[in-house]
UniProtKB/Swiss-Prot annotation:
Residues 400-409 have a biased composition (Gly residues). This is Collagen alpha-2(IV) chain. Residues 1533-1756 form the Collagen IV NC1 domain. Its main location: secreted. Residues 72-81, 225-235, 326-335, 410-419, 428-453, 564-582, 699-714, 731-783, 865-895, 946-977, 1040-1051, 1077-1086, 1108-1146, 1210-1231, 1280-1296, 1367-1386, 1462-1480, 1499-1510 have a biased composition (Low complexity). The lineage of its organism: Eukaryota, Metazoa, Ecdysozoa, Nematoda, Chromadorea. Prolines at the third position of the tripeptide repeating unit (G-X-Y) are hydroxylated in some or all of the chains. Belongs to the type IV collagen family. One of its GO terms (molecular function) is extracellular matrix structural constituent.
């Protein structure tokens, strides 16, 4: 209960006392007697007496009814602890408990008593031999022995004396004697016969190259047809294996859970809960970084006009300004006052005879002439008059300025070849390349525009919605009204400034002086025919009247079209001699000067009036630089093909040539080679120039930053309530800024997995993204064409006659003067900054810069996310003593503790019940001597007896009375664990203990929830230097890093190369000078230009062929020729490296359609193209075979349902069509059965990234519609969409339209090709964290199923919750050129640049001061029609109420035929027409050069069968052929495993098929037990490697992986043994590779047990030889062995450590010392049944005792023995 209901006890006590007090005061009645002893009288009633004393308490009343329940009283205090309850009844026997933990080892027991003697032992071993005894007596002599062996031959005896005997027989041949000395050389023998031809000797060394032979005769021939394709080669080896999967993370895998149940139905919505309490305000965030500079705001309203300032001091006179641009022509004024009489004009031509005049004064006499008539109306401007006669020659004018370069002359004669020049500069970048093929389809497009407005809903007001998130800033408002004119700026810089824009039209000047009479006007247009005069048959003609006044000058006519160039005029008469010049002496010719900077192009010179004759041919000029491509010439005759020369060395750069003529637009060329990066230029000086003329409309830029909201406008007038209706729902606001980071929510419960939805429709177009990074500056646009001139304005009012004007404008420029001297002037002042140049071609990457200085500390970052829990830290120092904590809740039952210290003696307990008699105890040790007892009574002394033997222990006596408590006993053995007692009272908090020893680190817990982002810590101390790590191997190429921070600004580079010539400057004003003196007659002039080429002469006779000339210089690139015919298709080249993506070229104009090329070889099936425009209908073709499936067309409008047709006759079966294109993506089918495991595919190569697509061509202009009626009719039906029209002039921004209705959902589009990576999108809203799913088992990748039928378009889905933020994508390729953005803000003024290096010679100097005013020039030609004026203000907005949609009106009358439209764009090429008639036979061409030898031709068609021949005579029998190859056999499924013992995959023996390859597994060890693999069986070749290729599972449906100390052992390679265990990618070089092959017969291993290689049995062939590997052991004496008949027992390579141990959980491998390999040894024949002699072999001699072996396969041609 709340504390408000508790009433304190001390408040109740006084109220009780008060009640008690009131009840005790009762009435007291006093009796007043009124009797008299005398008389009795009745007195009046007295007043009430005072109350009497309180009466005694009354008797106890009846028990009242129970009252209502009172308020609950206060909580009582805790009662004192009650006495312990009585002992409960003994409970039932419990079930057998879980076996307890083993107890601690007990203390050592006392030593036992000595045991009895043991049984007699076994007989001992024989003793050692005794010492030799004393020698005995000699025995008797023995028996005689056997005869001994014959003795050695004795010495030679003395010769006997006797007679000579008869000759003996011939003895045996003696031993061959020693070789004799060599004899002298003999004479030469006769020459022998010619011997047989000897064997071919070895090739000698390569001889020197021979001299070049004479050129051969030209061969005649043509390229032969392509040869047949060769036979299919043998199957290549299997490709490399796929990537090795990484070992999975440690963890415990829980068995599969059941399938989720069906999703329940959606429940009713619950009631709205109460509003929660307001949260506490969050912590104030750190101040944000300064934002970007905002857009310039809208102009504010004009302020009140300020006070007029005081007039300033007069400024100094400014510099003379440059000539401004020509102003716009003014409106023609009213005619001025009549001028003075002009010079008399030439007599006009005699006019036509007029009609007879009216009769004179009388009937027969002429009347007097009438007064002159009024001047006629202003005539229309007449046509231009004929050229006047040439005037007399004027005086020679002053020498003009040197003219600009003339038009390029005709090419001179070809000069002698110059010396080989140096390498030229890089050429001008070529025109953009040919438009590439359409790229891959891009990613899905952006969210589309909102659809049309839906049907108005019913206006039932809904509940008020929640406040939306604040929207983003709106787009910048419309342009405001023009502000007041700004303060006048400072005067411009006349020396260094650029010419400004044309100034505004000045006020009307004062009236000028009367001018001289003007030249006679142009003749007027003949007037209309006059009324017929009165007829007078007899009247004479009237006299000729006086000449009338000149009429008003006509209005200027519109500007005519530019005429064709006129014919050159006749030669004028020579002028008068000029004034004599100062006599000069011709100086010697100076040395040729360096090439000057290219001059600005001058004005076109006047046509010369001299008749030119071709001069003598000049010396050959130097070759100029390559000009721009000239106009496309006519197609020339084909020339003779020249001999292909060797490419020459690059020549030196020639001087700059004249600018070439602009070429015709052709197809854009390929991208040029990127140039070298230019050097950084110096910053220039100068003020910024005035804005240039407006260029053509650029493409829309990237969207600018959102502008600030405009100022709030004034409040509008209130709308009457009658017109208030709920408006249509507005568009969704822009998404608000992301709110502050919320508190971390609790993780939600995992939801059930819903069924897979149908594929959604394409989403709506997304909101515009944040502005991207600024793109590269585009190329400057081409200046726009001049707009159409407006109509002339109305004539102005007549001005008052003005005062004398200032001197007039200088006259027109004079004729082109003689060339001036060419001395180089002094360098001019620094030029103005040029326009921004085009972006250079990206340079080669620079060298890495020097290491920069350490940067300043950065701005503190935002608070980071909570990290994962760290590793256990080192134990900390003991903390200070803590405050005692509150008593905790009782803990769970703990395990039994060790025995405690002996307790203090307890109080004596009550006497217990008598126990059952115990078993007899073990006799105790002798006790210590007791205390002396009380002296007994003295007995009689007895005789001392002998000590008796120890008696048997007696039966236990009756239990005596309970004695006094003895001393505490020794500690007993630990008892069994008692049952859990009641929870005791919480103890008093103890003292804080000393800090314990730090415990062992616990196992890793689950990762915690993400914590609150912590503050940034301080930088740690630098660590100690680590041990050197193992030698690194080259890692794989990493992902591209994020772009680095921009580096510091580098030092200033040297000045750049001179720029390209600038644009043509404005025309300068002509200078004025004093007339020079007459010069002497000059030297003869330069030879004139060559004349025009004459008409072509008749064809001459063929001359004799000349000698081949020297190789000429490479000519200028010719204009692109007409497209040639398609050549034969080349052989496919090798796949090139991916090039860098080129810059997208400009879209070129469409080229002329090329000729139809020869049909190419049928290419591979291409990707599906976009559907083309329908062409015109061609002629009906012959019926073709069934074509390939076409692309799906756009869905048509549904047609009306037709009547059901009758069944047709069954058709013939058609030919089998080509497989169709893959259909649209179908609905997901039911889950299929698990497929068989497929073979792992070879990894594919990376595809080339697609090029960005080009901007598409403009479409065809739409057809003009019929003119509509101007009355606002009812709304008609929507027409069919027209073809897109040409771009119109940009209109004024229209009024904001009403939102459209939502459109129908479109059909699902065709699945696009994967697009290029887009620009990273804006950061999405943080999504709700999903519950981490359980890790599924890896399935075997199935084969891709067939695409299903396309699904129906699904309903439009609800917007999903924002997903979690994805990782930052790689930077995408540059996107397509964006639309031009809103104009950016002007940047801040940059720092002043460093002074630059001295510049190259500047342009010609500034214009000098003005000369004296010249004589007024002649009237100029009428100006061109002025530009149209600015758009007037918009008219008043008509108030138009939206009418109802009317019925469709009747068909209108056909309109008037419109004017002929502009010619349309070239159409798409139509279908090929029928072949034309064969043309006439052309002339014979020149014989061509011999072609390259053609490839082997295809075999010809078989010839016609010849005439049957006469049968020939029978031939001789041929020799018997070799035995044929064995017939086809079927593989019997024998498997052979080959281990390479290297990191290379072995090849199968010839004739065998490789089934798979992998890694050589020897055995595995789990739970301290090993399992061996026979290396000859396929199970020893695992296709994937892992240090832990298995996991183990127990009976609890739990499997554990990489959680124990299990191991795997693999055959290893010859890689050197590492010092430390290797891990991850470092393991691969140590694991042997293997291949499993299918053999045609059985395979065995034979062992020789010697160092000789054994032979295979008869009928068996050898596969490989090796060493006999028998057994192996590893950790814990576990291991295995090989069957000696298996090929796995014969390893090709011997090494003492043929395998490596890998620890599964750690993921490392190493050669440990307890690994042993066992090999068969060599056994000699005589050592078979002997005791082996121990022997130790050192490195280098190990193979001397290892048995050799051979693996054999049964020959397929051996017939099995059939008994």
């Amino acid at each position: 209960m709340s504390s408000r209901l508790r009433i304190p006890l001390w408040l109740l006590l006084p109220t009780t006392a008060l009640v008690y007090f009131v009840t005790t005061v009762s009435t007291q009645i006093t009796c007043r007697d009124c009797t008299n002893r005398g008389c009795f009288c009745v007195g009046e009633k007295g007043s009430m007496g005072i109350p009497g004393p309180q009466g005694p308490p009354g008797a106890q009343g009846i028990r009242g009814f129970p009252g209502p329940e009172g308020l609950p009283g206060p909580k009582g205090q805790k009662g004192s602890q009650g006495p312990p309850g009585p002992q409960g009844i003994k409970g039932d026997r419990g079930i057998i408990g879980v076996p307890g933990f083993p107890g601690n080892d007990g203390a050592n027991g006392r030593p036992g008593e000595p045991g009895p003697p043991g049984a007699p032992g076994w007989d001992g071993c024989n003793g050692t031999d005794g010492a030799p005894g004393v020698p005995g007596l000699p025995g008797p002599p023995g028996m005689p022995g056997f005869p001994g062996p014959p003795g050695v031959p004795g010495m030679k005896g003395e010769p006997a004396i006797g007679y000579a005997g008869a000759p003996g027989e011939k003895g045996d041949a003696g031993m061959p004697g020693m070789p004799g000395l060599p004899g002298p050389p003999g004479r030469d023998g006769f020459p022998g016969e010619k011997g047989d031809r000897g064997d071919v000797g070895q090739a000698g060394p390569r001889g020197p190259p021979g001299e070049a032979g004479p050129p051969g005769n030209p061969g005649i021939g043509s390229i032969g047809p392509k040869g047949d394709p060769g036979e299919q080669g043998p199957r290549g080896p299997q490709g490399p294996p796929g990537p090795v999967p990484s070992t999975g993370a440690k963890g415990t895998i829980i068995g599969p859970e059941g399938a989720p149940g069906m999703k329940g139905e959606k429940g009713d919505p619950g009631e709205a809960g109460p509003r929660g309490f307001p949260g506490t305000p969050g912590v104030a965030g750190q101040p944000g970084l300064p934002g970007m500079k905002g857009e310039k705001g809208l102009s504010g309203p004009a302020g009140p006009r300020g006070k007029e300032g005081r007039p300033g001091l007069p400024g100094p006179p400014g510099f003379k300004g440059d000539r401004g641009l020509d102003g716009l022509p003014g409106v023609p004024g009213l005619p001025g006052q009549k001028g003075e009489a002009g010079f008399p004009g030439r007599d006009g031509a005699k006019g036509a005879r007029g009609p007879p005049g009216p009769p004179g004064g009388g009937e027969f006499s002429d009347g007097p002439p009438g007064p002159p008539g009024l001047p006629g109306r202003e005539g229309q401007p007449g046509p231009p008059g004929a050229d006047g006669y040439p005037g007399p020659p004027g005086p020679q004018g002053p020498q003009g300025l040197p003219g600009g370069p003339g038009l390029p002359g005709l090419p001179g004669l070809e000069g002698l070849p110059g010396p080989k020049g140096e390498k030229g500069d890089s050429g001008i970048p070529g025109a953009p390349g040919v438009q590439g093929p359409p790229g891959l389809a891009g990613p899905p497009g952006a969210k589309g525009e909102p659809g049309p407005r839906g049907v108005d809903g019913q206006s039932i007001p809904g509940l008020p919605g929640k406040d939306g998130r604040p929207g983003l800033d709106g787009l910048p408002g419309r342009k405001g009204e023009m502000g007041l004119p700004g303060v006048r700026g400072p005067p411009g810089d006349s020396l260094n400034g650029l010419p400004g824009p044309p100034g505004p039209r000045g006020p009307q000047g004062p009236k000028g002086y009367d001018g001289r009479d003007g030249a006679p006007g142009l003749p007027g247009i003949p007037g209309p025919k006059g009324d017929r005069g009165g007829t007078c048959a007899f009247c004479a003609h009237g006299a000729k009247g006086e000449k009338g006044d000149a009429g008003y000058a006509g209005l200027p006519g519109p500007q005519g079209e530019r005429g064709l160039p006129g014919i050159p005029g006749a030669t004028g008469a020579p002028g008068d001699d000029g004034l004599p010049g100062a006599p000069g002496r011709p100086g010697p010719p100076g040395p040729p000067g360096q090439d000057g900077l290219p001059g600005l192009p001058g004005q076109k010179g006047e046509p010369t009036q001299l008749t030119l004759r071709p001069g003598p041919p000049g010396y050959p000029g130097q070759k100029g630089e390559t000009g721009f491509p000239g106009p496309r010439g006519q197609e020339g005759l084909p020339g003779k093909p020249g001999i292909v020369g060797a490419p020459g060395l690059p020549g030196p750069p020639g001087p700059k040539g004249e600018p070439g003529l602009t070429g015709l637009p052709e197809k854009p060329g390929k991208d040029g080679i990127p140039g070298l990066p230019g050097l950084k230029g110096e910053p220039g000086y100068g003020q910024p120039g005035m804005p240039g003329l407006p260029g053509m409309k650029g493409d829309a830029g990237l969207p600018g930053l959102p502008g600030l909201p405009g100022a709030v406008g004034p409040m509008g007038p209130p709308v009457p309530e009658s017109q208030l209706r709920p408006g249509p729902p507005g568009k969704d606001g822009l998404p608000g800024l992301p709110g502050p980071k919320g508190e971390a929510g609790f993780p939600g419960a995992p939801g059930l997995q819903g069924p897979a939805g149908l594929p959604g429709l394409p989403g709506m177009k997304g909101n515009p993204g944040l502005p991207g990074a600024p793109g590269l500056a585009g190329l400057p646009g081409i200046p726009g064409e001049k707009g159409i001139a407006g109509k002339p304005g109305l004539p102005g009012l007549t001005g008052a006659k003005g005062e004398a004007g200032y001197p007039g404008q200088p006259g027109l420029p004079g004729p082109k003067g003689e060339p001036g001297p060419s001395t180089t002037g002094p360098p001019g002042p620094p030029g103005f900054p040029g326009l921004k140049g085009k972006d250079g071609i990206p340079g080669a990457p620079g060298l890495p810069g020097l290491e920069g200085q350490r940067g300043l500390p950065g701005v503190p970052g935002q608070k980071g996310e909570i990290g994962l829990p760290g590793l256990a830290g080192a134990p900390g120092f003991p903390g200070a003593k803590g405050e005692p904590g509150l008593p905790g809740l009782p803990g769970k039952e703990g395990p039994q503790g060790p025995p405690g210290q002996p307790g203090a003696p307890g109080f004596p307990g009550q006497k217990g019940d008598e126990g059952l008699p115990g078993l007899p105890g073990v006799s105790g040790m002798k006790g210590d001597t007791g205390l002396p007892g009380v002296p007994g009574l003295a007995g009689p002394p007895g005789q001392p007896g002998f000590p008796g033997q120890k008696g048997q222990p007696g039966f236990p006596g009756v239990a005596g009375a309970k004695g006094e408590a003895g001393l505490p006993g020794l500690p007993g053995a630990p008892g069994q664990k008692g049952e859990q007692g009641l929870a005791g009272l919480p103890g008093i908090p103890g003292m804080k203990g000393a800090p314990g020893i730090p415990g062992a680190p616990g196992q890793d817990g689950l990762p915690g929830l993400p914590g609150v982002k912590g503050d940034r810590g301080f930088n740690g101390l630098p660590g100690e230097k680590g041990e050197p790590g193992p030698a690194a191997r080259d890692g794989e190429k990493g992902e591209p890093g994020l772009p680095g921070q921009p580096g510091l600004r580098g030092p200033q580079g040297p000045p750049g190369l001179p720029g390209l010539p600038g644009l043509k400057g404005d025309e300068g004003q002509p200078g004025y000078g004093a007339p020079g003196l007459m010069g002497e007659k000059g030297l003869p002039g330069l030879p004139g230009k060559p004349g025009r080429p004459g008409a072509p002469g008749p064809k001459g006779l063929d001359g004799a062929p000349g000698f081949p000339g020297l190789k000429g210089e490479a000519g200028l690139p010719g204009a692109p020729g007409l497209p040639g015919q398609d050549g034969l298709p080349g052989l496919p080249g090798q796949k090139g490296e991916s090039g860098f993506p080129g810059q997208p070229g400009l879209v070129g104009p469409p080229g002329l359609p090329g000729k139809m090329g020869a049909p190419g070889i049928r290419g591979e099936k291409g990707d599906a193209g976009l559907p083309g425009l329908p062409g015109e209908r061609g002629l009906d073709g012959l019926p073709g075979q069934k074509g390939e499936a076409g692309f799906p067309g756009a869905p048509g409008l549904p047609g009306p349902v037709g009547p059901k047709g009758s069944a047709g006759a069954p058709g013939f079966p058609g030919l089998k069509g080509e497989p169709g294109l893959p259909g649209l993506e179908g609905q997901p089918g039911p889950r299929g059965m698990k497929g068989e495991a497929g073979l792992p595919g070879a990894p594919g190569r990376d595809g080339l990234p697609g090029l960005p697509g080009m901007k598409g061509e403009a479409g065809l202009p739409g057809l003009p519609g019929q003119p509509g009626k101007s009355i606002t009719g009812p709304k008609g039906n929507a027409g069919l969409p027209g073809l897109p029209g040409k771009d119109g002039l940009p209109g004024l921004p229209g009024l904001k339209g009403e939102p459209g209705k939502p459109g129908y959902a479109g059909a699902a589009g065709i699945k696009g090709e994967p697009g290029l990576p887009g620009i990273p999108g804006a950061k999405g809203e943080p999504g709700l964290s999903g519950i981490p799913g359980k890790r599924g088992n890896d399935g075997i990748p199935g084969k891709p199923g067939p695409a299903g039928l396309p699904g129906l378009p699904g309903m439009k889905g609800e917007s999903g919750l924002p997903g979690p933020q994805g990782p930052a994508g790689l930077p995408g390729l540059p996107g397509l050129k964006g639309e031009p953005g809103l104009p950016g803000f002007p940047g801040q003024k940059g720092e002043t640049g460093f002074p630059g290096q001295p510049g190259i010679p500047g342009l010609p100097g500034m214009k000098g001061d003005s000369g004296y005013p010249g004589a007024p020039g002649r009237d100029g030609a009428p100006g061109k029609q002025g530009e149209p004026g600015p758009m007037g203000p918009p008219g008043a907005q008509p108030i138009v109420q939206r009418g109802e949609k009317g019925e469709m009106g009747p068909m209108g009358a056909p309109g008037i035929r419109g004017e002929k439209g502009l010619p349309g764009l070239d159409g798409l090429p139509g279908p090929s027409g029928p072949p034309g008639f064969a043309g006439a036979k052309g002339r014979d061409g020149f014989p061509g050069q011999p072609g390259m030898p053609g490839e082997k031709g295809a075999p010809g068609l078989p010839g016609f069968p010849g005439i049957e021949g006469i049968p020939g005579p029978p031939g001789l029998p041929g020799p018997s052929g070799p035995p044929g190859p064995p017939g086809p056999s079927y593989k019997d499924g024998f498997l052979l495993v080959k281990h390479s013992q290297t990191s290379e995959v072995p090849q199968c023996p010839p004739g065998m098929v490789k089934l798979w390859d992998g890694y050589s597994l020897l055995y595995i060890e789990g739970n301290e037990k090993s399992h061996n693999q026979d290396l000859g069986h396929a199970g020893s070749c695992l296709s994937r490697f892992s240090t832990m290729p298995f996991l183990f599972c127990d009976v609890n449906n739990v499997c554990n992986y990489a959680s124990r100390n299990d191991k795997s052992y693999w055959l290893s390679t010859t890689a050197p043994i590492p010092m430390m265990p290797v891990s991850e990618g470092g393991i691969e070089p140590y694991i042997s590779r293997c291949a499993v092959c299918e053999a045609p017969a059985n395979v065995i291993a034979v062992h020789s047990q010697t160092i000789q290689i054994p032979n295979c049995p008869n009928g068996w062939n050898s596969l490989w030889i090796g060493y006999s590997f028998a057994m192996h052991t590893g950790a814990g004496a576990e291991g295995g062995g090989q069957s000696l008949s298996s090929p796995g027992s014969c390893l090709e390579d011997f090494r003492a450590t043929p395998f490596i141990e890998c620890n599964g959980a750690r993921g490392t491998c190493h050669y440990f010392a307890n690994k042993f390999s066992f090999w068969l040894t060599t056994i000699e024949d005589d050592q078979q049944f002997r005791i082996p002699e121990s022997e130790t072999l050192k490195a280098g001699s190990l193979r001397t005792r290892v048995s050799r072996c051979q693996v054999c396969i049964r020959s397929p041609d051996v017939q099995p023995y059939r008994g």
